Amino acid sequence: MTHTRRKSLPMLSSGLTGRREPLQMEDSNMEQGVEGVEPGMPESPGHLTGRRKNYPLRKRPLVPEKPKACKVLLTRLENVAGPRSADEADELPPDLPKPPSPAPSSEDPGLAQPRKRRLASLNAEALNNLLLEREDTSSLAGTRRSRAGDPHRSRDRDRATGGWSSSKKRPRLGDLGGGSRDLSPEPAPDEGPRRDGDPAPKRLASLNAAAFLKLSQERELPLRLPRAHAEVDGRSTEPPAPKAPRPKWPKVNGKNYPKAWQGASSGEAAGPPGWQGCPDEPWPSATPCGPSVQPSHQPLSKALESPLGLRPHLPLLMGGQAALKPEPGRPGEESPAPKQELHQPSFPTPQLSPLPMPGNPADYNGLCVGPELTALGSFYLYCGQEGLQCGGYSPCPMLPEGKLSPVAAPHEEGLLLAPSSVPSGTPFQHPPWGSSRYCSSEDTGVNGYSICGVLPLSVTHAGTTCGGCPYKMPFAAEGCRSLGQLEFPLPEAGHPASPAHPLLGCPVPSVPPAAEPVPHLQTPTSEPQTVARACPQSAKPPSGSKSGLRTGSSCRHTARSKAARRPSHPKQPRVQRPRPRRRRRRRTNGWVPVGAACEKAVYVLDEPEPAIRKSYQAVERHGETIRVRDTVLLKSGPRKTSTPYVAKISALWENPESGELMMSLLWYYRPEHLQGGRSPSMHEPLQNEVFASRHQDQNSVACIEEKCYVLTFAEYCRFCAMAKRRGEGLPSRKTALVPPSADYSTPPHRTVPEDTDPELVFLCRHVYDFRHGRILKNPQ
C-alpha cells in the first residue's frame, strides 16, 4: 500500500467518531511499519497527532526498510550495493535469482572488493592479445611459450590437469561464431567454486584463444595428403613433408596476412605453398638454395610433363608486391579454386641477377604461368632490356629477329616473346629465384598471348583472334607499381601499336586506320536520319548531284560524303593538276565559267563553316547564261521522263582538288517530296507549286538541265493571265501605265519572257521545314 493510500484511509474513516479511531488505526499501522519511523519522533499537532511518516525524511540517516514486491536486479552493481537482511532474499519470487550474500569483512566498507572476471571477458582479452601481439599481459607470454615449445608436452600437461585443450575436442565453427563463451564446457567462475585440477580462468581463456586461432588458420591452409605408401589407383603417393613451424602473422597496412603457408602442396587440391624453400619446392625464394646446385637443361616441349615444372611465379610477375590469397574453406573439405584477389604480402622483393643464356642476350627472366591458379593457355618468356640499345633490341641466335619489333620508347624495360618464336629444342637454365626448371613453354591451344598472366580469363574465351601478337610487360624483376601497366602491347612488325583491352587481352585500335575516314563535324542538314523524313521514298537524286546516291537510292540527300569523294562522271577520274579548258567543258557538260574569278566564302559540304573558294558570277553553255541566285532544273535520273529537281544557285566555285566547277544551292521541295507525299487534306497545291527550304547542298554544274523561274503568288497569277491572253489571240500590253523603278523592279534576267514554257514556271507560297517535316505558312 502506498503512502498516499495510507494517508487517505484514516481521513475518510474518521468522520463523526472523533479522533480515537484514527489513533487506533494508526497504532495498527505502527505495529506493521514501526521499523520505518525513527523512535522519538515528535507527534504532529491537530488531528494528525500520533501519526508518523512511513518514508524517511530529509537529512536523516537511512535505515533498512521492508523491500517492495517488484525489484530490478543489476548484476554489475550487486557488489557495491548495501547489505540486505536475510529474510529479504527469502521473500523474493522464486523466478528471480538470489543475490549472493556478502562476506563479512573487517576492512573499510567504502572500498569495494574487485569482482571476479567472467570467462567471456577473459576469452576476448586473450584472443585480442594473440591477434594484436600485445606484450602487456603475462598470459600472452605464457601462451607464446607454450606455442613455441613441444605441442605434445602441452597436450600432456593439459590432459594431466584435466583442463580442456584443443586436442580433446574442437567446437564447431557455428559455435565459434555465436560467441567465445561457448568454447568452454566448464561452468563460469561466478556460478560455483572451482574444482581442484581445473585450469585457472586466464589459462583457460588462453587455451580457448589458441584453439580459435588454430581453427581459423586451418580454414585457410590447404589439406594435407593422406599418408599412403602403397599404390592407390595405379599411382604411388609420396609421404607428406615434415611439419614446419607455425608462421607469424605480420601486419601490412593495418591487416594481418600469413607470411608463410604450412604444409606441402602438390596437385590441384593444394593451395599456395610457402615462400621459402629449395628449387624442388613449388614456390620461389629470394635467394638460391645452394651455389652447388646445377640443374640440367631440358627442352621446352617437355615442360608440361612435370607436375612441379610449371608453377606460377607470382612474386616474379608482380615484383614481390602482390600475391593471390585463396578463399578459405571449411575443415574437411577440399580447398576450392582460389580467387584472383590481390593482396600485399610482406615477403622480400627478390633481387635478380642476369642469367647466362645461350646466344649472348641481355637479361633473361623466366616467367611461367601454370594451370593451377588460372586456366591460362600460354607461357611467357620475359626478356629484360636493361642492357639493350635505346630504341632497339639485341639479336640472338635463339630468337629470330623477324618475331620482335623495335621498341621506340627508351623507357621500355622488357619484352615478352611469343612461344611460337622460340625454338622448341632450346635449353634454358634454371633461374636462381624460381622453383621451376623451365623458363618457358609452348601451348598448342592458343596461338599467341591472347590473355595476360594475371587475368582470370579462360583459354576458350580468348580464342585465336590475336594472331600471335606478342605483348610487352612494362616492368622488370625489381617490381611493378600497379596492374594498370600490363595493358601496353608490343605488336609484331608491320602492325600498328595499340593499347590492349585489360580484360580481353587483345589489341583494340585507339585510332581509326589509314583507310578509315576521320569523322568530321556534320551540319544538321547532312544527317541521313533527319533528311530521310524530308525526302519522299519515291524521289531519286539527280545524276550528277553530290548529295545524292548513284546506287539507286530513294533519297537524294543521303550519303553525301561518299558521293562527294567521287567524280561526277564515272569515266573521268580525279586529278590534282588542272585540265585544259576543252576537257573541262566535257566534264561539266558544256558549262564554262563567265567573268573574272574571285576568292569568296561559300558553303561547302562537310565543312563546319563557309570555306574560301575561287568563285564565279555565272556559267554559260550554248549562249544560255545562268547567274548566281537563279533557279535551275537538275537531273533526277537517267531517264528524260524523270521529274527534275528545282534548286536556287547560291554560289559558283571551283573545286581546288579536282578543278571541277561546283555550285552551292538551296533545294525547293515538290509536293511529292514532302513528308507524307501529296495530301489533299493538308493543302491543295497547284500543279507547279514548290516549297522553299533552308536545305543547303552542293552539286556539280554538269547536272543542270536548264533555267527555270520560281515566282510569288502575285507574279504567278500575272504570268498565267498573260499566257491566257496569248492563247486567246489578244494582243499583249505594249506600254506600261506606270513606269517601272530601277531600284524596285525585277532584273531583266529574272523576268519571265513572254514565250517561256509554262512548265518552267513554278509557284512558291510557303516554306517547308525539312527538319521537322512541316509547312511554315508564315515563316519568320
UniProtKB/Swiss-Prot annotation:
GO terms classed as biological process: heterochromatin formation; negative regulation of DNA-templated transcription
GO terms for MF: chromatin binding; transcription cis-regulatory region binding
Superkingdom in the source lineage: Eukaryota
Modified residues (Phosphothreonine): T588
All residue ranges annotated as the BAH domain in the record: 624-779
Pfam hit, one: BAH
Cellular-component GO terms for this entry: chromatin silencing complex; chromosome; nucleoplasm
Biased composition (Basic residues): 49-61, 557-588
Residue positions, PTM Phosphoserine: S8, S101, S121, S184, S206
Gene3D superfamilies on file: 2.30.30.490
SMART domains on file: BAH (SM00439)
Maturation and modification: Ubiquitinated in a FBXO11-dependent manner; leading to degradation.
Biological role: Heterochromatin protein that acts as a transcription repressor and has the ability to promote the formation of large heterochromatic domains. May act by recruiting heterochromatin proteins such as CBX5 (HP1 alpha), HDAC5 and MBD1. Represses IGF2 expression by binding to its CpG-rich P3 promoter and recruiting heterochromatin proteins. At specific stages of Listeria infection, in complex with TRIM28, corepresses interferon-stimulated genes, including IFNL1, IFNL2 and IFNL3.
Domain note: The BAH domain is required for localization at H3K27me3.
Protein name: Bromo adjacent homology domain-containing 1 protein
Organism: Homo sapiens
Lineage of producing organism: Eukaryota, Metazoa, Chordata, Craniata, Vertebrata
Name of the coding gene: BAHD1
